[in-house]
A protein has these predicted regions:
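Residue position within the beta-strands of beta-propeller blades
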Residues: 51-53, 92-93, 133-135, 177-178, ...
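Short loop/turn segments immediately following the C-termini of beta-strands
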Residues: 55, 95, 137-139, 180, ...
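A short loop-to-beta-strand structural motif that recurs across blades of beta-propeller domains
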Residues: 59-61, 97-99, 143-145, 184-186, ...
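Flexible "stalk/tail and boundary" regions
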Residues: 65, 86-87, 101-105, 111, ...
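Blade-level signature of beta-propeller repeat domains, shared across WD40, Kelch, NHL, RCC1
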Residues: 260-317
Length: 317
């Protein structure tokens, strides 16, 4: 661990031309790292930091837009994702267990054996009531779990190829969920009081030839943004599931997206340098192209984000 953790030392190509799709977007590499699998970008408003993780290396970074510095927050074990707790700590969903990164930099175990040995956590999100929905992956037998604020866990879904990006509709009546291997973003009815999900249906399906849907977020207008692994782009969908625009990146393995910065006007995008062979690569995928590993920032006129919810999950000692 280096220093204090919070004080650092859907469809085919668009019908319009590519130039129009990205005309108002400025893409810049703000942290030229070599993350194996950069993921889980999350804006911390109190500390004005963009937090993200390199999953297999267990390194959590903090990027400060004011100084343009990116520092290591903590080095820990494999971490599939994390949430910001209401008290300012981080809840780390790791390979088999859940840990807490306190504001003073100490890491303590929260829940042991939270995920079986053949699974690991891959993407997580806090809901409006402080629960956490946590997806897992493991040999095509991944699950979606819900951790309530008392630490109890409920299995919401099983048989998932690769659990990934999640988000909520602005009226909090629906929850989006991504299965990357199925190349689909699903929409559920969401009951805020109970945390239950129902009426699963396909919101968007991504053609294999352009990549896999990975991390996602929902903007202030209720439009859905998804990062396409292998696709080197973000896609924005209307609340009706219609592809509205694309923003292209020089890195092919765009992995996740969040809004951050003043007024949540900036989009931060993680990427991955991972070069392992994958049968899910699109036909004709050029393995010589730049995959990624760094953190990118982009803006597009008139688009802003919404603050992410804080978790309030606590585990008995």
């Amino acid at each position: 661990m280096l220093g204090s953790p919070f004080e650092p030392q859907c469809g085919d190509r668009l019908s319009w031309p590519r130039e129009k799709a990205v005309a108002d977007a400025n893409v810049e590499l703000v942290a030229p790292l070599d993350c194996h699998t950069g993921e889980n970008p999350l804006w911390c408003e109190e500390r004005r930091l963009l937090l993200f993780v390199d999953i297999p290396r267990g390194v959590i970074y903090g990027y400060d837009p004011a100084t343009a510095k990116c520092d290591v927050i903590v080095r820990t074990r494999v971490t599939g994702g994390f949430t910001l707790q209401e008290d300012g700590s981080l809840l780390l969903f790791q390979d088999g267990c859940i840990a807490v990164l306190a504001k003073n930099g100490t890491v303590s175990e929260g829940a042991r054996n939270a995920c079986p040995g053949n699974e690991r956590f891959n993407d997580v999100i806090a809901d409006p009531e402080g629960r956490v929905f946590a997806g897992t992956l493991g040999g095509g037998k991944g699950r979606l779990l819900r951790f309530d604020t008392d630490g109890s866990v409920t299995e919401m879904m099983r048989g998932i190829g690769c659990a990934n990006g999640m988000g909520f509709t602005p009226d909090l009546s629906g929850m989006y969920f991504t299965d990357s291997f199925a190349r689909r973003i699903y929409l559920f009815d969401y009951d805020r009081r109970s945390g239950n999900l129902s009426k699963k249906r396909t919101f968007a399906k991504i053609p294999r030839k352009i990549g896999l849907p990975d991390g996602m977020t929902v903007d202030a207008e209720g439009f859905v943004w998804t990062a396409l692994w292998y696709g080197g782009r973000l896609q924005r969908y209307t609340p009706k599931g219609k592809l509205e625009r694309e923003i292209f990146f020089p890195a092919k393995q765009t992995s996740s997206i969040t809004f951050g910065g003043p007024g949540l006007h900036e989009m931060y995008v993680t990427t991955a340098a991972n070069s392992e062979p994958d049968p899910l690569q699109p036909p004709g995928y050029d393995v010589t192209m730049h995959r990624g590993g760094g953190l990118y920032r982009t803006t597009t006129e008139g688009v802003t984000g919404r603050p992410e919810f804080r978790s309030r999950v606590h585990f008995a000692p």
